[in-house]
């Protein structure tokens, strides 16, 4: 598998590794056959770092965005111009990580399920980033947790099909998957599907069209089932692909090639 160099990881956060560790992580990814990694920002600082990392590593691409967890912050006027400039960088191939998250944040203690102001702030920030993505013809890398009933209507209202995109770490149901696919969005799967209780996701993977699938690790988060460490990394995308191939009962090499094409088509890359 390592010799093919066709594996792709649509969603990681390389800025979360110390610099020396990140370099080791990228070397292991290359050795495992990973051709492309997209590192996503969550705010202005991490988006700038994503662009910096991508500019310094030929196998890394950048995605810039405002994560729903920070969407309620008051951003000064100059912030928007700085963000727009990052989105225009040559190594920037997508807008993300953007979206909606109505699940209470255990890290910050912020509750969303009963806080209408925070939910509206997320929706407003999301709509603004969809508009920018459409303007710059950049696909969206969408984060969605506990908000699938709101996601599709917003994408439809904002005509997000003009930009297209991928819902990373998809956790919705079959009906929600169909709606997103009908709008031209792809669904990305990662470590979650490796767990024995992920039967609903595995069923969705089995039925959706092959041209609607992408693979991710969300490194350094979302470790795989029975992984030896708590910290995930892009090299593990090889195992995710093998599990998807097993679920779909298809040849692993054929699946890798198909996902590689999906990745290139979404991000407008040359094969």
Q: Each predicted region: which residue ranges?
A:
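Mid-domain alpha/beta scaffold segments of enzyme catalytic cores
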Residues: 1-271
């Amino acid at each position: 598998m390592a010799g093919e160099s066709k594996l792709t990881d649509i969603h990681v956060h390389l800025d979360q590794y110390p610099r020396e560790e990140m370099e080791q992580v990228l070397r292991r990814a290359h050795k495992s056959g990973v051709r492309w990694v997209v590192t996503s920002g969550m705010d202005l600082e991490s988006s700038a770092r994503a662009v910096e990392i991508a500019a310094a590593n030929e196998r890394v691409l950048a995605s810039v965005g405002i994560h729903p967890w920070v969407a309620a912050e008051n951003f000064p006027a100059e912030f928007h111009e700085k963000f727009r400039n990052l989105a225009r960088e040559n190594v920037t191939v997508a807008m993300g990580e953007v979206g909606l998250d109505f699940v209470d944040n255990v890290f910050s203690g912020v509750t969303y399920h009963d806080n209408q102001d925070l939910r509206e702030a997320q929706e407003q920030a999301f709509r603004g980033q969809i508009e920018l993505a459409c303007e710059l013809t950049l696909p969206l890398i969408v984060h969605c947790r506990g908000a699938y009933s709101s996601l599709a209507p917003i994408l439809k209202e904002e005509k997000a099909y003009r930009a297209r995109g991928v819902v990373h770490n998809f956790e919705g149901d079959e009906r929600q998957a169909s709606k997103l696919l009908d709008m031209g969005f792809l669904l990305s799967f990662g470590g979650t599907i490796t767990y024995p209780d992920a039967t609903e996701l595995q069923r969705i993977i089995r039925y959706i069209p092959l041209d609607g699938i992408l693979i991710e690790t969300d490194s350094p988060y979302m470790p795989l089932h029975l992984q030896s460490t708590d910290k995930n990394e892009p090299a593990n995308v090889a195992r995710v692909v093998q599990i998807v191939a097993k679920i779909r009962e298809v040849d692993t090499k054929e699946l890798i090639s198909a996902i590689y094409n999906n990745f290139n088509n979404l991000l407008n890359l040359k094969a």
